[in-house]
Amino acid sequence: MKVWMAILIGILCWQSSVWAVCPAWSPARAQEEISRLQQQIKQWDDDYWKEGKSEVEDGVYDQLSARLTQWQRCFGSEPRDVMMPPLNGAVMHPVAHTGVRKMVDKNALSLWMRERSDLWVQPKVDGVAVTLVYRDGKLNKAISRGNGLKGEDWTQKVSLISAVPQTVSGPLANSTLQGEIFLQREGHIQQQMGGINARAKVAGLMMRQDDSDTLNSLGVFVWAWPDGPQLMSDRLKELATAGFTLTQTYTRAVKNADEVARVRNEWWKAELPFVTDGVVVRAAKEPESRHWLPGQAEWLVAWKYQPVAQVAEVKAIQFAVGKSGKISVVASLAPVMLDDKKVQRVNIGSVRRWQEWDIAPGDQILVSLAGQGIPRIDDVVWRGAERTKPTPPENRFNSLTCYFASDVCQEQFISRLVWLGAKQVLGLDGIGEAGWRALHQTHRFEHIFSWLLLTPEQLQNTPGIAKSKSAQLWHQFNLARKQPFTRWVMAMGIPLTRAALNASDERSWSQLLFSTEQFWQQLPGTGSGRARQVIEWKENAQIKKLGSWLAAQQITGFEP
């Protein structure tokens, strides 16, 4: 049974990482990319352990480390350890730090919990791990996690942290505890405030040479008492009595993954005294401490929070021309999940903005969700060794180009079709960019209103348009003929807001053509500059030709 459970969990892990495909690199390119990222992470490790500083956010470090491991596995290299051991770590832990295996999702956690009982959930406090050794009731030794077997002697530093009891009694008088030294926070809401680089800040304080008063800004959360009382309730009570009160406050019994999910969500949104990056589920029954080894803990697992920002690989750079002629740049990404949203594209902005970001295919960028769930770029966290950037199209477009189709007008022409089909314009439900591209590719539109001439048979025979949908589209196209005059003028791209257009009382094409600049200028929200744009627009030859064509189609307001 356990074998099958392991297989199922493995399948789930594989499914969750299926998007992380191997790069299509030559062996030489792979060696160069891996070597460069390896050197950078080593430099970050040196800064972290030697000087107690971090030049990179914890979340970015973790994700790039995972990316390096992925590349190494893809190309047969030996994966590195997640974190480099302290260079001077020579103090043996009385009990090894095992580390904790990560569950990819709730289903994997449920499978793991199914064969275990007496389970408890704790916050996965974000700081640095430590061993506290008490002998004869006094703090005898404090050791950094290091490589799990050996670490640095932190006794002097920890003795200055007021939150760490220096004396204990009873069962704890001769005990070994494992826990997390963390940055004390008041009302930290993880959902809103994120990780604030807490791990690096704690490491920095612990690595400083001077015994600064700032050590009192640190606290400790004990998460393991090897060879302690068998009952979790007894452990929690003794720890609380000794002064480790947070462990009792934030340890809860759970029966299934649903209960864990509720607690996890509660702590994600609640005010806590520390930064967290998920939860840990542990069985009360643990093996004897002499059997503990790094990476071999079967009695506990972690279920981390989804990062607020994800590192994503840029697969391609694409250029889009909007209906106004402005060129925008879009990065196509290897898919990442943000909240419940699968993100595959992110808008960079103008060509100038793209050049300032200096983004090329193969780069790694940090992506998060802005307001209304729109993906945005936060940073470029890693640039590839080979960087070939595409050439942007010539800036030959403006607000009066591409009403008629041509090879050079492809993108702006499609943008105009998407615009006129929008709800606030002609309201053509059921068709978006892909549908317009399919129609134009098959029927070779002459101009932006050519779709009015399509027959039901033509729509049915359009590749990419389902037959069940073609009748609906034909109905939508016919309904558009009955839209008010102002909607058709908006579809033609008149440079006015809808409110200004409605206030104009213009209800016919001939009336609009004879209106003066002074008339347009007195409309709400329309200054002299916008009024001149309207005059330029209505005098444009393409616009006049479209107006005549709509008149021939007997569209409301365009009839002679």
UniProtKB/Swiss-Prot annotation:
Catalytic residues in the record: K124 (n6-amp-lysine intermediate)
Reaction equation(s) it catalyzes: NAD(+) + (deoxyribonucleotide)n-3'-hydroxyl + 5'-phospho-(deoxyribonucleotide)m = (deoxyribonucleotide)n+m + AMP + beta-nicotinamide D-nucleotide
Gene Ontology molecular function terms on file: DNA ligase (NAD+) activity
One matching Pfam family: DNA_ligase_OB
Keywords: DNA damage, DNA repair, DNA replication, Ligase, Magnesium, Manganese, NAD
GO biological process annotation, one example: DNA repair
InterPro entries: DNA_ligase_AS, DNA_ligase_B, DNA_ligase_CS, DNAligase_adenylation, DNAligase_N, NA-bd_OB-fold, NAD_dep_DNA_ligaseB, NAD_DNA_ligase_OB
Reported cofactor(s): Mg(2+); Mn(2+)
Assigned EC number: 6.5.1.2
Entry-linked PROSITE patterns: DNA_LIGASE_N1, DNA_LIGASE_N2
Gene3D superfamilies: DNA ligase/mRNA capping enzyme, Helix hairpin bin, Nucleic acid-binding proteins
Role of this protein: Catalyzes the formation of phosphodiester linkages between 5'-phosphoryl and 3'-hydroxyl groups in double-stranded DNA using NAD as a coenzyme and as the energy source for the reaction.
Family under the similarity heading: Belongs to the NAD-dependent DNA ligase family. LigB subfamily.
Protein name: DNA ligase B
